């Protein structure tokens, strides 16, 4: 039946065989990571269909049978279509009695504008529910991180005119200079982080540094918030400026404390290892330690090797803010 209903190339069949062997032989576990890293998502989906046709088993079920713990969770995430993964993470964070605030922050504050629109549609198709309504109901509107997440989940990013940037420059300065957390100032940050395009935010960043003797917007965020609020607003800032910055920041937070946060390590890695090519560069530049060294210290066995392998070892950042591909600004890594 499989031969009749599924035409498969020798290449895809070979990948399926590689996945099977990697699951069954512990010494070949990292082959699962190599496949996820080297094959684009559309080819991975084709491989999964071929896997089921050959073995008669869903890939997820096969992986769960042979893998365990953090490595299993990571691999399962890597082999899911991105939009499906994001929806499942959000669903898992909001269902049940409690809310996984950290997961909602990590997911909703580090996806691009076009993805937010796509996720809204897919979420409704999968769960017959509105993403915005679910997030709003689960997070409430009491905490500042929740207000920010709600704004991102329901808003749209709109290009600004020069005069609008100049007006916001004044409001941002006022927010930074205001002692204590005030409603109007928080609203300014939320509006900017939830509705600015990346190009406009980078321009605002440059304008602020020029006008205020090299001061950084991020420093203002650091002084403004605490706890999860601080993490959320820093993450939103970094992602809007450059996804590589956000990935490095979040991974460093996951490493901090008495034990590392493997849930966050898995989320951020699975979501961003493909496009954030400058993460390791930025990590070393900001945190003073090579990313691979930190992984070796904090993580054990094949799981640690997998995390290191997925993030590419880039030593030189992309150089130009004006360097574009297909009309989209390419992520870059600069000093904040």
Predicted regions and their residues:
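Structural signature for extended repeat/solenoid scaffolds and their inter-repeat hinge/linker regions
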Residues: 1-336
